[in-house]
From Swiss-Prot:
Its main location: plastid. GO terms for molecular function: proton-transporting ATP synthase activity, rotational mechanism. It is a multi-pass membrane protein. InterPro entries: ATP_syn_F0_a_bact/chloroplast, ATP_synth_F0_asu, ATP_synth_F0_asu_AS, F0_ATP_A_sf. This is ATP synthase subunit a, chloroplastic. Belongs to the ATPase A chain family.
Length: 249
């Protein structure tokens, strides 16, 4: 009978630890006829609370010469304003700063929460806590909100003539132009979801294999890529809105 030597047993144990890293474990809440992912709602509420509390603290005692939290908040708002102005256009950007800013801050803090907050230490009846953007439902919802926003932008400015863009520069391109508007939210959602999920899985696997050494630089890299993903999503959302306002691709 074949028996494993100690090195093979150790290798088997490591493989078992890696295989225990699962995707798709959820805590389901029943809301009427629908089942929702409870852990996503919990972490989303935490992220929204962080944004609201920070905003209230920074703006409760505004000073002509900003300092501390107010200074940081004004820097963030200036960055978001410049981003929106560049993508949407100087004439139309002001009304879209709150939308683009909310998208950016929610995604940014959600992504960072996955790397900085030890969600998995909090035990649930089933499933486990993770960054809200680690769930495809969250990223699809954000992408659909972006789709609604750029359709609203085009229709509010041009009315029904907005749909004339689908036959530009030639009616032959009608199916392709329609398909493009469907692929925009898909590309936004899958890009964000894939990057955040991959980052968390890589860190989880490395922690199971080398608990102390390798995961730290990978977590730092994850923080950087998480910020980049938030910037890409907000930039593309603003660019799509700008395209709708201009009336062409």
């Amino acid at each position: 009978m074949y028996s494993l030597n100690p090195s093979q047993i150790e290798a088997s144990n490591l493989l078992y630890q890696v295989s225990s890293v699962e995707v798709g474990k959820h805590l389901y809440w029943q809301l009427g006829m629908f089942q929702v992912h409870g852990q996503v709602l919990i972490t989303s509420w935490v992220v929204m609370a962080i944004i609201i509390i920070t905003s209230v603290i920074a703006s409760r005692n505004l000073q002509p010469i900003p300092s501390g939290t107010q200074n940081f908040l004004e820097y963030v708002l200036e960055f978001i304003r410049d981003l929106t102005k560049t993508q949407v256009g100087e004439e139309e950007y002001r009304s879209w700063v709150p939308f683009v800013g909310t998208l950016f801050l929610f995604i940014f803090i959600s992504n960072w929460s996955g790397a900085l907050i030890p969600w998995r230490l909090i035990e649930l009846p089933s499933g486990e806590l993770a960054a809200p953007t680690n769930d495809i439902n969250t990223t699809v919802a954000l992408a659909l909100l972006t789709s609604v926003a750029y359709f609203y932008a085009g229709l509010s400015k041009k009315g029904l003539s907005y749909f004339g863009k689908y036959i530009q520069p030639t009616p032959i391109l009608l199916p392709i132009n329609i398909l493009e508007d469907f692929t925009k939210p898909l590309s936004l959602s899958f890009r964000l979801f894939g990057n955040i999920l991959a980052d968390e899985l890589v860190v989880a696997v490395l922690i199971s294999l080398v608990p102390l050494v390798i995961p730290v630089p990978m977590m730092l890299l994850g923080l950087f890529t998480s910020g980049i993903q938030a910037l890409i999503f907000a930039t593309l959302a603003a660019a799509y809105i700008g395209e709708s306002l201009e009336g062409h691709h």
